[in-house]
Amino acid sequence: MIQLIALDLDGTTLTGDNVISERNRNALLEAMAQGVLVVPATGRTFEKMPSCIRELPGIQYAICSNGAAVYDVRADRNIYENLMPYETVAEMLRFGDEYKCFPEVYLKGRSYCRLSQLDLVMEYPRLSDYAAHVKSTRLPVESLRRFVLDAGCGVEKVNLWPKRREDFPVMWGQLLENQAVSITSSGFGNIEINAHGCDKGDGLLHLCEYLTISRENVMAAGDNLNDGPMLRFAGESVAMGCLLYTSPSPRDR
């Protein structure tokens, strides 16, 4: 019997304009009315999820930042974290600078970027499609490295947007050799960097252990590379028609 449904957001639960259809909303409400836990599982922080998800009655837990934070909505705290130390974050930011990337840092449930680059979003081909969203949701700081160092805590995720499309496979190959991190992509031309072993599947595993729910009683649905680990973990999985996680190479991103 299904006790928990883990749902990717972009491309799965949400429509292209970042909202949930009435049909999907009603289906989730019906599942929750029957006692099933509905858990958003996303590369975003909880704060950056659209309000139609955050404010959905009955949402108790969320897997955020690709599993780096498992958030208890009602208690307003993380019940599990898998974070990167400053040294790893600084290394990833230096790496991104080598390829003139637009970097983002996810820390304590918020997304940060460099103030000096915020007005240059349109220069990044893949990022330019989300320029208005980025400018309205990212918190700008003078120096990401200094900000992380001063924060004195681990980082959930580093998100790199390459300026040149041809740099993506080169960067991907180099990062695959780094044993300190796990990498994935949500299909938008970005490279999402987490602590080694951190992914949506790991976050879902720890949530299930916390709730004492067997994986056989879990359903997961997703459509992209970063959904693969949780689809493999769940007893029942629903892969959307545009699923990319089985792609042999990131060259088409």
What are these language model-derived features?
Residues 245-250:
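Conserved small/polar residues in nucleotide/adenosyl-binding loops
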Residues 22-126:
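Active-site phosphate-binding/coordination module
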Residues 95, 106-221, 225-227:
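Conserved acidic, metal-coordinating active-site core of Asp-based
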Residues 3-16:
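Asp-based phosphoryl-transfer active-site loop
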Residues 37, 102, 182, 236-237:
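Residue-level detector of anion-binding/catalytic polar loops
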Residues 43, 219-224, 239-240:
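Glycine-rich beta-to-alpha transition loops that act as phosphate-gripper elements at the mouths
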Residues 35-39, 59-60, 157, 216-217, ...:
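Short active-site oxyanion
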Residues 31, 66, 204, 230-231:
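Hydrophobic residues within well-ordered alpha-helices
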